[in-house]
From Swiss-Prot:
One of its GO terms (cellular component) is plasma membrane-derived thylakoid membrane. PANTHER family: CYTOCHROME B. The keyword Magnesium does not apply. InterPro entries: Cyt_b/b6_C, Cyt_b/b6_C_sf, Cyt_b6/f_cplx_suIV, Cytochrome_b_C_euk/bac. HAMAP family: Cytb6_f_subIV. This is Cytochrome b6-f complex subunit 4. Keywords: Electron transport, Membrane, Photosynthesis, Thylakoid, Transmembrane, Transmembrane helix, Transport. It comes from Thermosynechococcus vestitus (strain NIES-2133 / IAM M-273 / BP-1). One of its GO terms (molecular function) is oxidoreductase activity. Component of the cytochrome b6-f complex, which mediates electron transfer between photosystem II (PSII) and photosystem I (PSI), cyclic electron flow around PSI, and state transitions. The lineage of its organism: Bacteria, Bacillati, Cyanobacteriota, Cyanophyceae, Acaryochloridales. Belongs to the cytochrome b family. PetD subfamily.
Amino acid sequence: MAKVLKKPDLTNPALRAKLKKGMGHNYYGEPAWPNDLLYIFPVVIMGTIALVIGLAVMDPAMVGEPADPFATPLEILPEWYLYPTFQIFRVVPNKLLGVLMNASIPLGLMLIPFIESVNKFQNPFRRPVAMTVFLFGTLVTLWLGIGAAFPLDKSLTLGLF
């Protein structure tokens, strides 16, 4: 079984000399306690909270158009995260084929770990097959999501052609 953590070789005299000077953490990783957990994380959390509260107070933007219970919109769109699947249902003429295509998405996601399992590298740039599949899936998802906001006749070309 492969090791998850890289432990330092404390018998190395060069590393021991660096550690005496307060250096050498990059050799085996900087310790999370107390550096990250006590100092960096609270600063990031407080900064994020301050940013969200500041934006909410300074610019209370409307989320969308006010609701009118007496007027039905021309096209009802789902939430933004459902745009790609909505676009598949909208574009594919056969609804059973649309359901099968949407069912293939989780199946494809389950197959991702097995695509390049023989490659032992963790760096994504040294795993070309997995990186290509990931980038292709991301681009198709973005293309379908953006196309769902267009009318049906322009949704596949995104209004470019």
